[in-house]
UniProtKB/Swiss-Prot annotation:
This is DNA polymerase III subunit alpha. The keyword Ligase does not apply. Belongs to the DNA polymerase type-C family. DnaE subfamily. It is found in: Cytoplasm. One of its GO terms (biological process) is DNA replication. It comes from Ureaplasma parvum serovar 3 (strain ATCC 700970). It catalyses: DNA(n) + a 2'-deoxyribonucleoside 5'-triphosphate = DNA(n+1) + diphosphate. The gene is dnaE. The lineage of its organism: Bacteria, Bacillati, Mycoplasmatota, Mycoplasmoidales, Mycoplasmoidaceae. DNA polymerase III contains a core (composed of alpha, epsilon and theta chains) that associates with a tau subunit. This core dimerizes to form the PolIII' complex. PolIII' associates with the gamma complex (composed of gamma, delta, delta', psi and chi chains) and with the beta chain to form the complete DNA polymerase III complex.
Length: 969
């Protein structure tokens, strides 16, 4: 039987159409006992391939194809040692290290498929001389059958950024598909086929799982890690409780001893010490770390080590949700770090434990429908407008199923008939890895050399990157650490620094009032723009109903506001405000469910209920909770029987037991992690506190972090007006990339990075130019920018958006004279004639209104509109007998009252010679045109540019014409 022994999968990255499942399917369909994988240079798919082969009772043949001394070799692992050697070689290849293959490779079979290299080993074979004693039957496989050749060529075209026609005409890949026995007999000599069968009997690799391989925290210390951990925890607990020896609450002492015993028994002491160490590094270097994330916030050990900042006993959090004696997997402490400095913490880990013991984690960017259509469309030379139209009609839910997308969309059906080749090739590319990436948060650590355990390659900053993706790492004993960058922590850090710079105050967020009535009043009124977790419209509605009064309430709201639990919000609110009666099964369950008014909100409540009612131990209770969340019916059937029997033995009656079980079963899988929810609620509270008491600093930082999002920017700018904060445009005399504040004047000024087209390099150039110069008037600033090689065009933009307005010279004057100023500044010490500035028109700032379009173009908004946005709140609705309507409500039947700011007025003539006036206005932050006809031209005298009015407006022949002026604001 012929076995294809040089098969490439799509993990060769755009060099094969074959998925691992395709390899397995071919072997099964053809009743072959072996299946082979020999990807080019890498081992990305090795473990997925091995697992799936074993699951289908196939013998996996693991190989590696690579270039060596001008030859193309394929190496195969005969056994586990051979597999480890392939790992080494792949790592060396992918990190550009030179290596030498010795003749005595007992654990490998090596085949030379191209070139003339020779090894003196009985395990060496070649393909070029089919009659030589060491000939072997080998054919490169890149696609399944002849019909898929076009898909393979498309992949090559995408990879090399060429047109498909180029590969159709120049490349011969006719036989690079799976070969059957008949084809193999015609392709290869009997010697080669016999050697193939001989080799197959030698390739019997078994890949072993490995024990946990945690680096030792401090190898130089004679004290064992468990004792170091214990002493750090005891010391940390005293600090946390502000207590001396003998004064520590016994509950804490007992809980700490229990947790340490579990951690020590599982041999996780070093894991906790490593996390403690890098978090301590971060905090010691002014890097803000989140108060906790995930179930780790339920650990007292983590609290004592300052890994988390949530007291688990005070908040009744459960350690076993994080780690229990029966848990087989490693603990998982995820850490939030301010995103701007996350890389510093990761670099610390690389430096402390060494490049050979730390690695980033590989991910794959896989082709989805839209990406495949774009790639294939490009190589087929299809017009981009056509491709855009197709992609626009592929809904996100069909991004992995083009057939279904076509079936559900009429336009796609039509496009399919016009571009069948495009769609058919794209379908077969979906889910193929296009390129590799790096896991957003995770890194791995190992006490042994990582390259001795898994294959690696070069990643970010040439640091090691695993070749195996995340799901295949834990089995090899590698420790994964998730360090997540959280923008909200950076915002907090920036706000605290700005408060210190402007008010000389140092705010310790761990010592603020966590029951501040004004902060909770803000939350109850949903004043939560910019507040982590709490600013979406849906969440605001929930806050208005629930009216949180403490941190736990924030936690509950966050836990309820998810797709499943949302159904319980109404019940929760009704019970909270005593509008709905309810009862508990007994006093024991009351203690568990009372904080959430009888509703299961948290996973920890499930654990406590099961433990209390059925007398399960805490570990079994957590297993029960896991089974429900995963809907594992097999385990649930057994656990249900155990639960009922336990409850009956605990003096519960059968009907009540059944009722309780059904209730738990119905709602438990919606339960949220209490530890995580509570920890994140502290971040929400911190932001709400800073917003209430340091509004100017908070909004300034928030604006700097959201300047790329126009909608959010407008929302936050409008909110600033509600706080009576003035918003000013960027000012060259207060140059800053970010938004800046004037505390005394209650002003926030735009940062220069908000100016469209002003990237990092240009901003650095401007900053450097200003720092090197003596600055006094507008001419000295222009001179400084000129000397700093800032172009005339960019200086013109700075003028157009108002950065020179603070000199009291209007933009029109500066622009009209800019060329002359630019030419004459710095010449023999003579500057532009300053006497010209005395002209009245140079100081008439009202002409700046004509540059509103420039503000919109370069800032995304005209600054006058910010003043307009708040005027809605200043109308005396009691005196007005009408309601302000939206622009789209204007109609032909009656007047619609519209609030608008006038940006510009243009006069024209109709065909009949009548006057007509077009008012360019801003309505709900959108530009709209209103019209005044001849019979109402007298209204023009009452309207000024920049003014805000309530107009009575009607629709006539597509004209939105002004009937009257109701009020000037």
């Amino acid at each position: 039987m012929f076995i294809n022994l040089n098969v490439h999968s799509h993990y060769s990255l755009l060099n094969s159409t074959l998925s691992i499942d395709d390899l397995i399917k071919y072997a099964l369909d053809n009743k072959q006992p072996y299946v082979c994988l020999t990807d080019l240079n890498n081992m990305y798919g090795c473990i997925e391939f091995y697992d799936k082969a074993k699951a289908h009772n196939l013998t996996p043949i693991i190989g590696l194809e690579f270039e060596y001394q001008n030859a193309t070799l394929v190496a195969y692992a005969k056994n586990y040692n051979g597999y480890l050697k392939l790992i080494k070689w792949s790592s060396w290849i992918m990190t550009s290290k030179e290596f030498e293959i010795q003749d005595d490779f007992d654990d490998l079979i090596i085949v030379c498929k191209k070139g003339t290299i020779v090894f003196k080993s009985p395990n060496f074979y070649q393909t070029h001389d089919q009659n030589a004693p060491n000939a072997i039957a080998l054919q490169s496989v890149f696609y399944a059958n002849k019909n898929d050749k076009i898909v393979f060529l498309a992949m090559l075209a995408i990879k090399n950024d060429l047109k498909l026609e180029d590969f159709k005409n120049c490349c011969d890949f006719d036989n690079n598909h799976f070969l059957n026995d008949n084809l193999a007999q015609s392709f290869f000599s009997p010697i080669a086929l016999n050697n193939l069968n001989k080799v197959l009997n030698e390739l019997k690799v078994q890949i072993h799982d490995l024990p946990i391989n945690i680096p030792v925290y401090d190898k130089q210390n004679s004290i064992i890690s468990s004792e170091i951990l214990k002493q750090l925890c005891i010391s940390g607990l005293k600090k946390r409780l502000n207590a001396n020896d003998g004064q520590v609450n016994k509950i804490y002492v007992q809980r700490l001893k229990y947790e340490l015993d579990v951690i020590n028994e599982k041999q996780f002491d070093d894991y906790f010490l490593i996390v403690y160490d890098f978090i301590n590094f971060a905090k010691s270097n002014g890097i803000i770390v989140g108060p906790g994330r995930g179930s780790a916030a339920g650990s007292l050990v983590a609290y004592c080590l300052h890994i988390t900042d949530i007291d688990p006993i005070k908040h009744n959090l459960i350690f076993e949700r994080f780690l229990n004696p029966t848990r087989k997997s490693m603990p998982d402490i995820d850490t939030d770090i301010m995103d701007e400095k996350r890389d510093l913490v990761i670099e610390y880990l690389f430096e402390k434990y060494g490049n050979d013991h730390v690695a980033y984690i590989l991910t794959f960017q896989r082709l989805k429908a839209k990406m495949a259509i774009r790639d294939v469309g490009r190589i087929l030379g299809i017009d981009l407008k056509v491709i855009d139209k197709i992609c626009k009609n592929i809904k996100p839910e069909y991004d992995e199923d083009l057939d279904l997308a076509i079936k559900k969309n009429t336009i796609l059906k039509e496009m399919y008939l016009l571009h069948k080749e495009l769609f058919e090739i794209s379908k077969k590319l979906i889910n193929a890895p296009r390129q590799i990436g790096t896991h957003a948060a995770g890194i791995i650590l190992s006490d042994s050399l990582i390259s001795n355990i898994i294959p690696i390659q070069l990643g970010i900053n040439d640091r090691p990157l695993s070749q195996y993706s995340m799901e295949y790492l834990e089995r090899f004993g590698l420790i994964k650490m998730d360090l997540l960058g959280l923008k909200n922590l950076t915002i907090i850090d920036n706000v605290l620094k700005m408060i210190y710079e402007n008010q000389n105050k140092k705010i310790d967020l761990f010592n603020i009032n966590y029951n501040d009535k004004f902060v909770f009043e803000d939350l109850a009124k949903a004043r939560t723009n910019g507040i982590f977790q709490l600013e979406s419209p849906g969440m605001k509605k929930v806050l208005l109903k629930v009216k949180p009064q403490n941190i736990e309430d924030i936690s509950i709201v966050s836990a309820l506001f998810r797709p499943g639990p949302q159904q319980n919000i109404k019940t929760f609110v009704e019970r909270r405000f005593k509008r709905e009666e309810f009862s508990y099964w007994n006093e024991a369950t009351r203690k568990i469910l009372e904080p959430t008014y009888g509703i299961i909100v948290y996973q920890e409540q499930v654990i406590e209920l099961v433990k209390t009612i059925a007398n399960f131990d805490i570990a079994t209770s957590d297993n029960f909770r896991r089974a429900i969340s995963k809907k594992d019916e097999k385990i649930l059937i057994q656990l249900k029987d155990d639960f009922i029997n336990g409850a009956l033995n605990n003096n519960y009656k059968q009907p009540l037991v059944n009722q309780i079980f059904e209730y738990i079963f119905s709602f438990a899988h919606y339960g949220f992690n209490h530890s995580h929810s509570l920890a994140y609620s502290y971040i929400s509270y911190w932001l709400a506190y800073l917003k209430h008491y340091y509004t100017l600093e908070f909004l300034s930082v928030l604006l700097s972090h959201t300047s790329a999002s126009k909608d959010k920017l407008l929302s936050y700018l409008n909110e600033a007006k509600e706080f009576n904060i003035s918003i000013k445009g960027p000012d060259i005399q207060y140059f800053s990339n970010d938004f800046v504040i004037d505390t005394q004047k209650q002003i926030i000024r735009f940062g220069f990075k908000t100016i469209k087209g002003f990237g990092d390099e240009l901003l650095k150039k401007i900053k450097s130019a200003l720092q090197k110069s003596t600055l006094s008037d507008y001419i000295s600033y222009i001179d400084a920018l000129k000397k700093g090689n800032v172009s005339l065009k960019n200086i013109e933009i700075l003028i157009r958006v108002g950065t020179f307005d603070s000199f009291g010279i209007n933009r029109l004057f500066l622009l009209n004279n800019l060329n002359e100023i630019f030419e004459k500044t710095g010449l023999n010490g003579h500057f532009f004639d300053l006497n010209l500035v005395g002209l009245d028109y140079a100081k008439d700032m009202s002409v700046n209104d004509r540059y509103l379009d420039d503000e919109i173009q370069y800032l995304g908004i005209d600054l006058n509109s910010l003043n307009y946005a708040n005027y809605k709140t200043e109308i005396d609705y009691n005196k007005l007998k009408y309601t302000i309507k939206d622009f789209y409500e204007i109609n032909t039947n009656y007047e619609t009252n519209i609030l608008a700011q006038v940006l510009n007025i243009k006069q024209s003539k109709t065909k009949n010679g009548n006057d007509i006036f077009y008012l360019e206005t801003l309505i709900d932050n959108k530009k709209q045109t209103l019209t005044i006809f001849q019979n109402s031209k007298y209204l023009i005298d009452e309207i000024s540019i920049g003014g805000i009015y309530v107009f009575g407006v009607k629709l006539l022949n597509h004209f939105n014409f002004i009937v009257n002026i109701k009020q000037r604001i």
